[in-house]
């Protein structure tokens, strides 16, 4: 999710598309953050599923995002694990509901745009990476977006992503973890990486 957010910012995602970075005690995959009674029409955080699906709307061609991740990881053969993608698409009813809520609140203009963003998000979640590869991508962030002396990511976008991880990277346990392990920026995910 942080890499989706960074990529979206690099592609021109306006900060107002993710209205603010607000930690919440809600689960990462709830659509409650977009309910009419919350008076919010934009996801409040780029690291919950609503925010990540919203960020995925900035991916015009998924191959471009994959090329970005290949560059960061140093693996030119990085790919989507098609069996994981197919399984996720068959069982992601909650994320479909979130994408439709994003359409209903005006984040996406059409149902097709919302479903394309959902597809991009699901494909991104199914990219097969090793711990060494994700570490290499994180090293690029730690070096301020530099690879071999070339600025490949805006430092401002890295700061935004790190701040997002610091405020909600471990979802509803972020506050507890931040208190016990001050300064640790992390993101929990299903892969365990």
Model-flagged regions — what are they?
Residues 1-14, 137:
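Active-site SXXK
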Residues 2, 128-146, 193:
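Active-site-proximal alpha-helical segments within enzyme catalytic domains
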Residues 10-124, 140:
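Active-site-adjacent helix/loop patches that line small-molecule binding or acyl-intermediate pockets
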Residues 49, 92, 128-131, 155:
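Electropositive phosphate-/nucleotide-binding environments in soluble metabolic enzymes
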Residues 98-100, 125-127, 161, 191:
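Structural beta-strand/beta-sheet cores of well-ordered domains, especially the beta-sheet scaffolds
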Residues 112-113, 130, 136-139, 148-160:
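A conserved catalytic-loop motif detector
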Residues 119-121, 144, 156-159:
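Cytosolic covalent-transfer regions centered on His/Cys nucleophiles
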Residues 148-193:
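Conserved SxxK-family serine transpeptidase/carboxypeptidase catalytic domain
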